[in-house]
């Protein structure tokens, strides 16, 4: 009964099915961990959601920024971001709202002491130890799954505040927790988020670090599995930090990491021209 962590799918249903065939997935016994960004930009977000929703063994899911964007559209009155969104089919589906309510009750962080694994979409903020990260994930999850979710989704967008403080309260506190868990790539030496630069590591400004290389980063006792950052192509500088977004939608691959032995499996994704 192996566990597999699956990288960012982003509505790429066919590559997901090919990947599950490659790993000889047994839906009655195996457990899938989804690192988030199940939806958007790819052609089959509705099929992806329906498939994962129907799995007989409950999967572990950490929400990504595109998943939260869908929830903002469904429940927060958020406007369409632009022509790159491919969520209309979900929005118009008879079961779209049902799938949304299921999605908003998923996690920001999943962990297993037995497997020595913690998973979240973008990573763990350099300023947080594992206990702090778990507590803050639980705090945000309670809002997403509770009665005040409409208010949160209506106001979740924004780049400020951009650094964690225990003194933060209200929506500012929830927003920075959200941004660390779902949007983070680069931080400065003090752990401050930089959500503006999205280029390559080689061209990054000197004052910015990948979140897992920030000098003040607190050590996490477990191996970390994260997605969100296709440009890394599955590589990080740390042997216990596993990047599994390998750019399925952008001419790369869709990757699964078997958590028992950290072995990787990949299938080709879509070429960029697929959506031009």
Swiss-Prot record:
CDD domains in alphabetical order: MPP_ApaH
Keyword entries, A-Z: Hydrolase
Source domain of life: Bacteria
Single GO molecular function: bis(5'-nucleosyl)-tetraphosphatase (symmetrical) activity
Keyword Isomerase annotated: no
SUPFAM superfamilies per record: Metallo-dependent phosphatases
Protein family (similarity comment): Belongs to the Ap4A hydrolase family.
Name this polypeptide is given: Bis(5'-nucleosyl)-tetraphosphatase, symmetrical
Native species: Legionella pneumophila (strain Lens)
Lineage: Bacteria, Pseudomonadati, Pseudomonadota, Gammaproteobacteria, Legionellales
